[in-house]
């Protein structure tokens, strides 16, 4: 389902998602309006693909509600889960810069709503104001910085601390339920299912979370943040 964006249709929660995003929130009111006018609302049901690896560029997106999985299917038939996108996160800008096909598969993990900024709208935007190339470049470099941080974490941090960091990244004070199976969470962290289950049990015994099939619920997010930052629970 796709409909042209009516700015008045953005509810308070959706506006808050955009305003609290560091990239979008750095723009002036006029720049925000200029970008949003090019947006189109997209609605996805759980399990519905947004686009597939190899597909042509169709626009840049931002998640307003729900969660999306980015994954890749190896030629061996094994699927690699790369990351989970939550409200306020942008995607699709790589293919905008290099004009190459999509690098990975993206599908909705839950019922989701997004804003799409189609290719033709983006072309019109940068023609009107070439500085948008620099602004979109800043969005891309934010992703690169996060990627380097994650690579460093994988090399240096113990598995429990990396798990805590990822759980904090996938949640906030209002969203404490993470709709992931334990095996999926392990794939995001490059941990075995056995190791992931063992670490989750330890965190559950400490009262930080509880697990149900397909869902991880955080019970003490502040303590989890401490573990993510310091590698241990502070008294």
Predicted feature residues:
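Short phosphate-coordinating micro-motif centered on Lys-Gly-acidic
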Residues: 49-55
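Glycine- and acidic-residue-biased ligand/ion/polar-headgroup-sensing regions
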Residues: 47, 58-71, 87-88
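Cyclic nucleotide-binding regulatory module and flanking cytosolic helices
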Residues: 1-46, 95-96
